[in-house]
From Swiss-Prot:
Family assignment from sequence similarity: Belongs to the universal ribosomal protein uS7 family.
Assembly behavior: Part of the 30S ribosomal subunit. Contacts proteins S9 and S11.
Protein name: Small ribosomal subunit protein uS7
Lineage: Bacteria, Pseudomonadati, Pseudomonadota, Gammaproteobacteria, Enterobacterales
MF GO annotations: mRNA binding; rRNA binding; structural constituent of ribosome; tRNA binding
InterPro entries attached to this UniProt entry: Ribosomal_uS7 (IPR000235), Ribosomal_uS7_bac/org-type (IPR005717), Ribosomal_uS7_CS (IPR020606), Ribosomal_uS7_dom (IPR023798), Ribosomal_uS7_dom_sf (IPR036823)
Keywords: Ribonucleoprotein, Ribosomal protein, RNA-binding, rRNA-binding, tRNA-binding
GO cellular component entries: cytosolic small ribosomal subunit; ribosome
Length: 156
C-alpha cells in the first residue's frame, strides 16, 4: 500500500464517432506503437462489417460479442504452507471488460484472414454467436475455476 495519496484511475475520453467509452478502451487495446488513427480505422471498418452481417446497430453488435466473452470467475495463485493453490475468485467488472477485449484482440491477431479489420470482424461475429477463440478462452478460464472450487475457502 502506498504511503502517499492514492492516485485515481485516469478517465478515458469517449470514442469520437460513437461516444462510447467502452469502444475507446477497445481502440486503445488494439493500438500498436501509439498509432491510434490506424487502430480506430480498423475498429470502425470491423464494426461496419459486423453490423452488416448481423443486421444490428454497431454498438449493440459489439456489446453482444463482448458480453459473450466476459469472464465471471478466474483463478489466482495462492501460496499456503509450501504449496500453491489455484483459488477461484470473482472478476471485478472493470477487469471483466479489459480481459474480454484483450482476448478478442489476441484471438483476432492469431486468425489467418487478409486484413486486421476482417480478422477482428470475424472474431467479433464468432463471439456474438458464442463460438471462436475468445469464447473458448473464457470457457477454459471458467472450467479451471470450476475444477478448483474446492480451494475457494482460501480466498483473501
Amino acid at each position: 500500500m502506498p504511503r502517499r495519496r492514492v492516485i485515481g484511475q485516469r478517465k478515458i475520453l469517449p470514442d469520437p464517432k460513437f461516444g462510447s467509452e467502452l469502444l475507446a478502451k477497445f481502440v486503445n487495446i488494439l493500438m500498436v506503437d501509439g498509432k491510434k488513427s490506424t487502430a480506430e480505422a480498423i475498429v470502425y471498418t470491423a464494426l461496419e462489417t459486423l453490423a452488416q452481417r448481423s443486421g444490428k446497430d454497431f454498438l449493440e453488435a459489439f456489446e453482444v460479442a463482448l458480453d459473450n466473452v466476459r469472464p465471471t470467475v478466474e483463478v489466482k495463485s495462492r501460496r499456503v504452507g509450501g504449496s500453491t493453490y489455484q483459488v477461484p475468485v470473482e472478476v471485478r467488472p472493470v477487469r471483466r471488460n479489459a480481459l474480454a477485449m484483450r482476448w478478442i484482440v489476441d484471438a483476432a491477431r492469431k486468425r489467418g484472414d487478409k486484413s486486421m479489420a476482417l480478422r477482428l470482424a470475424n472474431e467479433l461475429s464468432d463471439a456474438a454467436e458464442n463460438k471462436g477463440s475468445a469464447v473458448k478462452k473464457r470457457e477454459d478460464v471458467h472450467r479451471m475455476a470450476e475444477a478448483n472450487k474446492a480451494f475457494a475457502h482460501y480466498r483473501w
